[in-house]
Amino acid sequence: MPHNPPEGYTRITPYLLYEDAAAAIDFLTSAFGFTERMRMAGEGGQGVAHAELEYDGSPVMLGTPGGEFAGPASTGVDSPAFVHVYVDDIDAHHARAKEAGAEITREPEDQFYGDRTYGAKDPQGMSWYFAQHVREMSAEEMGPG
């Protein structure tokens, strides 16, 4: 009986749409430290129909918009969601992303819930939020909710 989800996948996996998926793959691997798992060429061998990246074993799928599906660059509207990624060294990750040209939307900052975080946008307008869990916090320590 096959595994569901397949091995190497999670039950929830972001699927991101980029006008230039090949450029997005290059940026996400160089700026944010993702690893490319696979890439399928589009019709006639052009562009990227589907690709899969991962960060520390967590997959992200991406492709080129088409039909009813559109990415933030094609709509002219900010991404209505963001991808949240835990990293091992938030400050080094921030420096790498900034050096690679990511638009930093929120500088690294300690949060009340025990994470140190920063926000960024990639060159095609996708929003990303990176975090490092730096201290354990109880619900009482975090305050009223």
Model-predicted segments: where are they?
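Vicinal oxygen chelate
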Residues: 1-15, 25-121, 131-145
